């Protein structure tokens, strides 16, 4: 059996009782290409912004040494009461076989959570024998085995028709926003099959990468795709967690960065999700997301605005949000310095937690 992604490094990487940041030294990351793009505020024109790459240039990213006073830090929390978790079962200290032996318990409400072969399940309803909580269609679609299997086998590639420049270019663009928090931890929220989780892990720009999704089948695909890649670098820094985006199992102010690739339009409540992201981000932490927005006439024709609301209510999709609404959500949730890049329906946005 191949080594599980959720491996023995749980005891040194996530540590429900004590999260120890890696001792990082200054390194240079030489990117193979430089992404040139224009970042504008939402108050600027909504015209499309072109995204170019220059394969002849390099971008240097320097990871600064972390403050010694931040050497130990809690991160995992109970999704019910948001208090810290403690080990119940931690087989042999370092878990080298499967996550199924992991069991943690909330120090306050005493609710326990466990892991399976592929991931640690920290959803509120995890372990329920009879209760099943249905989600909106846009969420349930990605919980199906078929869509989870197809996501990196043709599904995601079709996003190019919506203006998405492709995972590699999107990763390069995101790094520019994430530069202030390099060397810290990052949550790849709604990670799907782990496309960006693997890119973040392989880059070695972060001390810990948490691949988080609500779909069990997506996390299984993430696990399988990772373990198919022989000698995948920095595997010990990647952890798979199942959780609800609107109920993140992390302590307040414990996370350096949150990335959400092509996900925001599928969240049942974008405002609830961004509020949670704002809660877990530390001061100065960065939120970066990409999504589709088909604003156009839906943003200014009254009849179509009402139709938009009905479509979103029944489908659970939020593709008809506009730029100003996305900025409003971020501001309402306590995030500042909203910027964005557009290319047709594609938008990459970034906002930060005030320092």
Swiss-Prot record:
It is found in: Plastid, Chloroplast, Plastoglobule. One of its GO terms (biological process) is biosynthetic process. GO terms for cellular component: chloroplast; mitochondrion; plastoglobule. GO terms for molecular function: S-adenosylmethionine-dependent methyltransferase activity. Its EC number is 2.1.1.-. It is an enzyme of class 2 (transferase). Keywords: Chloroplast, Methyltransferase, Plastid, Transferase, Transit peptide. It holds the Pfam family Methyltransf_11. Coiled coil: none annotated. Residues 1-49 form a transit peptide. It comes from the Eukaryota. Belongs to the methyltransferase superfamily. This is Uncharacterized methyltransferase At1g78140, chloroplastic. It comes from Arabidopsis thaliana. The lineage of its organism: Eukaryota, Viridiplantae, Streptophyta, Embryophyta, Tracheophyta.
């Amino acid at each position: 059996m191949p080594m599980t992604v959720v491996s023995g490094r749980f005891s040194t990487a996530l540590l429900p009782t004590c999260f120890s940041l890696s001792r990082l030294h200054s390194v240079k990351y030489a990117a193979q290409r430089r992404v040139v793009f224009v970042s504008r505020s939402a108050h600027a024109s909504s015209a499309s912004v072109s995204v170019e790459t220059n394969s002849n240039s390099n971008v240097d990213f320097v990871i600064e040494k972390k403050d010694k006073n931040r050497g130990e830090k809690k991160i995992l929390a109970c999704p019910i009461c948001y208090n810290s978790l403690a080990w119940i079962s931690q087989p042999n200290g370092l878990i080298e076989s499967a996550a199924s032996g992991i069991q943690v318990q909330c120090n306050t409400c005493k609710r326990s959570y466990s892991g399976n072969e592929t991931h640690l399940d920290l959803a509120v309803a995890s372990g329920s024998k009879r209760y099943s909580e249905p989600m909106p269609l846009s969420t349930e679609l990605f919980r199906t085995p078929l869509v989870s299997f197809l996501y990196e086998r043709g599904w995601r590639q079709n996003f190019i028709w919506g203006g998405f420049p492709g995972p590699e270019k999107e990763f390069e663009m995101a790094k520019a926003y994430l530069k202030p928090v390099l060397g810290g931890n990052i949550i790849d929220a709604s990670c799907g099959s782990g496309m960006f989780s693997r890119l973040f892990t392989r880059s070695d720009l972060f001390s810990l990468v948490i691949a988080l999704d609500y779909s069990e089948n997506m996390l299984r695909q993430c696990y399988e795709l990772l373990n198919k890649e022989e000698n995948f670098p920095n595997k010990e820094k990647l952890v798979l967690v199942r959780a609800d985006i609107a109920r993140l199992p992390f302590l307040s102010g414990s996370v350096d960065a949150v990335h959400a690739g092509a996900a925001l339009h599928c969240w049942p409540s974008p405002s609830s999700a961004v509020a949670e992201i704002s809660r877990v981000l530390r001061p100065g932490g960065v939120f970066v997301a990409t999504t589709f927005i088909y604003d156009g006439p839906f943003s200014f024709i009254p009849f179509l605005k009402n139709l938009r609301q009905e479509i979103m209510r029944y489908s659970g999709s939020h593709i008809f949000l506009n730029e100003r609404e996305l900025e409003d959500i971020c501001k309402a949730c306590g995030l500042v310095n909203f910027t964005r890049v557009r290319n047709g329906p594609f938008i990459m946005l970034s906002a930060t937690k005030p320092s």
